[in-house]
Every structure is written in structure tokens, then in C-alpha cells.
């Protein structure tokens, strides 16, 4: 499923467009029936952990961490600040991906590099409103903004975690 925001403003407008583009291309390319995409998530504190959670409804959030019954997940995590240039805002956004490589039918070997390069090529074909800055691998590195999360997962052979950090440019549209 592709979980998209109903009411979009600011960075969420650009995230939603990129989310739809990536989700549609990933699902179509690999014929995935169990891939979940989420828009911007929140860094919510649960016990002593910082957990990525997607807003569902008033006071209700859905944890978006790995579910081993799925082919994979992706979600968007924004930096805690945006640079401003008049009405233009520039913000770093991490797109976090986890793929269950054993569930992907095209994988005869560990195709982690192939998956990263395909998604990187999608990003480079996308709008000029974003620019890829970095690709990060390794469970601890990917979930570095989420304190304690990596301790509960193993960076096992079947799962590939990576994030793409992109700079998104958007305009402040009057919301009043």
C-alpha cells in the first residue's frame, strides 16, 4: 500500500509527488504486491527509543519499521530545519528503504547494489526540485536519527537497508 497524506502543504507537497513516483516505479519494475510506502514520518519517543511513525488520524500513529512479511518499505524523514531564501525553502529529506531480498523474485544473488542503483537512477530522472546528496547503507547508519531502533534489528543477509538523502526545494505558499 502507498500511504499518502490527504492534506499536503509545504515540504509534504513535494514529498507526496516523489513518494508516488518512486512507489509506482518500484512496484511496477519488480511486480511487488507487498511493498509499503509512507510519506513524511514523525520521530516519536516510545519508552527510551525514537521510532519512525506515520500519522494516521488524531492521536494515532503507525510504526513504519520493518515487517518481515513484506517485500519492503520506504518512508520519508525530514531534517529538523529548512534553509530559507525569501519564499524558497530548502530542506534535507531522507528516504529510507528496506527490502527483503529473499522475497524478490528477480534476486538470484544479493542484488543490493542493483536495487540502490535503480532507485538512484529514478531519483536522477525526477524533478529538478530535488537533488540527491548521499546514499547511506548499513542498519546503524540508515537509522541513525532513530535512537535505539537498530538495536532491535539484525543487519541480516535477507534484508537490505539504505537511505537516500536528497535536498528538496519548495515555496512557502500562503496557507492563511
Sequence positions of predicted segments:
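Acidic-leaning, charged glycine-interspersed low-complexity segments
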Residues: 34, 39, 112-169
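Short histidine-centered catalytic/ligand-binding loop motif
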Residues: 102-115
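Oligomerization/assembly interface segments of phage tail-like spikes and tubes
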Residues: 85-103, 157-172
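C-terminal interaction module
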Residues: 7, 174-176
